[in-house]
Amino acid sequence: MGNSQTKEARPPFTPNRRSHGGGHGRSPYGDRHHSEGSRSTRGSRPDLSILGIGGSSERDVATLEHRRETKQEREARRLERERVARIKERERSMREEHVDGGYLVTQGVYTGTEDFNKAVVRQLMIERRLAPFWRGLNDFSDSWTEHQLMAAARGLPIPPPDEIPSELEYKNPPKITEGAKESTDTKGIQHLTVPITSRSQSYGSDASQSSTPAHSLPSPTSPLASGTSSSPLFRTRAKTLASLTTSKHGTQADPAPREIQLPRDPFVNGQPIEAYLYKDAAECPICFLYYPPYLNRTRCCDQPICSECFVQIKRPDPHPPEHGDSDPNAPAAAAEGDAADNQDSQLVSEPAACPFCVQPEFGVTYAPPPFRRGLTYASDPSARPNFTSPVSSTSSLSSGNVTAVTGRRRAASLSANDPTVITTDKVRPDWAQKLANARAHAARRSAAATALHTAAYLMNSNGNGGDSRTFNIGRRGVMRRAGGSDPHSSSSRTGSPALQALAFLTDRRSATNDMDSAEEGSGNIAPPRNTSRRNRIDDLEEMMMMEAIRLSLASEEERRKREEKEAKKEAKKREKEAKKAEKTARKTGLYSTNASGSALDVPTGLGRVASSSSSVIGEESTPAGKGKEVDRASPEAPIDATSTCSVTAPASMNAVYPPMNSADQHQSMQSSVPQTSPRELSKPSHLRHVSSASSSFSSLVESMSGDHTGTTEGNGSSTEPLFNFRSLAAVIGDEDKREESAEHVENTLSNPQAEGSASRSVLPVDHAHTDDSVFNADAATPAGSDFALQESQGYMIPKELETRSVEITDSTGNPQATS
């Protein structure tokens, strides 16, 4: 099936090896291949796993854990292997390879990541178009001798000038004889000979295979260095087949030039090569190390710079254009296909600038020394395709790619396209791919952000009601969703004037307002290609601005509501405190008034107050003031409840009138008490005192003349008011006429009651005039009200005062009435 291997793809001995897997060893392809094969086999043959042939679950778990551990450590092992390989390659290259006394690997000046293309740099150095990696000196002196220069160049301690260490001793090079010179020329000609097309295909294939290794460099002891071609005895069947297939039509595609090792010669003009190179050392202005004077020169300002500093200079990372300019050095395909997109928000990669004069398109030139040592190419790569030209085969070793070193400094700058100029882009040819990857990544992030913001806005719009099925992103869609909310949903944010203002803001750049509904529904989802990115960016910016303003308005509204709520709570608290203070002040003022006027002002002839007792008072609070309802219930004497201060009769009256139960007293009190409004109770005016005086003395008269009428037929439930006498003036007039034995009986029921009434209404004659004046003040005309008010001030008691039952004793020694 899909996971099982077909018959053609299986190894020839798979069934036999699988059947004898328990007795034989592991597969030669490794544990991973064996585990994958067994897993796929067990997955495709469940019957074997049921029978126990396919393997156990413990082995599967162990294999899975081992595979997971390998996956986690694979990258670390790979990095470690690469690091060890780089160290070995560096040591080998510094020991066996050099170019004119310099090296092809860095010398550790910079410890960062080497992200330049090492193959390109190696080729440029072997071609003498870029300076090799010279060994830098921390210190240099013009007075150093040859062996001191040699020690400094080799990294050894600098000896004294007059002392030559044994490892630095050298002998003068022997003179080259004619025979040796001819053999050397023959070897050089063999290395520079171009293969002839008339030779066999296998010979050309062997020569190309042996002399053009892809990544490994030849050593001096290799057959390539000795000049002998590989023997046909060492040819394998694979090489023969490859030569037949690749060289069938007589064309050879050799991508890499052929490297050769020049004869080893440690002397230049009779001097050691180190002494020759470092006798005129120059300082690099960037790393401040001393190098041989054969350094790179900037193309613009002709400043020296070493190769290690040069390979560290690169383009900045891709970034948005700072001044709205598109990348002038963008790839041609990108510039032609996405010209409209590049001008909007495409990332750009500006070329590196010169560290000295800040000229863009930084590049260097190199003038090699006048001698050749170490590695070189067999022929010029530009002349290799021309096989008919005999010049390349006869070119001498010393004359190839040698440029004359002029002592005069270059006066003019070179162009970045000059063939001798090496720019930073040539050292890092993958900058275009990195730029394309960065642009693709930025486009994906922008699309994801746009989708997220759009989805969030649509979700908010759907939750608020309205036309939730129009998934348009344009300004008109925003306007439509903002204005299309349900007017009945008061909690919706789209109905607020703030969001309407935002919707108007988003529509500020629209051209027309009448658009077809279908076109409006589609929005700006599929506009032309040249404006799609700009529209998406504008919509995203406006939606983000709308959301920010909406959040700001919402927070401001919430803050305002919170402040209003706190203000209301504070006002309510202050009002409550004011009411409480007013109530306390009123109560304190009333009690102080009561304290000053607590003694009942009665005529002096009536006697003194012997005792007082508090009565039950019903208190009722009203919004305008505080009124009190008098409920005076005495179990011994049935006294009228309408009076605030009553004068009790002698003790003989208690024997005449039996005590009344509390229900009869309460009913009698409710039927007899006049109803007063709260407004009247809360006004502390002189009219209130007048009414209090009237009520006091009317109750006094009632207690003297008509208390016995309150109980009819023994039940005491009379619905008729007790104030049914003619008038206070008439009653007082009748009392004056009868003098001391006067009687005023209404609704007389029996003789004992009449006698009791007569006994209760007996007052001293000398006080009748005073009481008469008070009672006449209550019934006087309005013209004489002021005089009556002044005269009766001594007998007024405020209505809110607690009613008290007092005993009045006669000066003549009448028996006291107990309350």
UniProtKB/Swiss-Prot annotation:
InterPro entries: Sip5/DA2 (IPR039301)
Polar residues: compositionally biased ranges: 212-233, 487-497, 641-651, 662-679, 747-760, 808-819
Residues passing through the membrane, by range: none
Keyword Transcription: no
Keywords: Cytoplasm
Cellular component terms per the entry's GO annotation: cytoplasm
UniProt keyword Cytoplasm, yes or no: yes
Record field: compositional bias (Low complexity): 198-211, 327-344, 691-720
Chief place of localization: cytoplasm
Location relative to the cell: Cytoplasm
Region span, Disordered: 1-78, 157-265, 317-345, 478-497, 513-534, 556-779, 792-819
Compositionally biased residues, Basic and acidic residues: 29-39, 57-78, 168-185, 317-326, 556-585, 734-746
Role, per record: May negatively regulate the snf1 kinase.
Membership in a protein family: Belongs to the SIP5 family.
Protein name per UniProt: Protein sip5
Species this protein is from: Aspergillus oryzae (strain ATCC 42149 / RIB 40)
Gene name as annotated: sip5
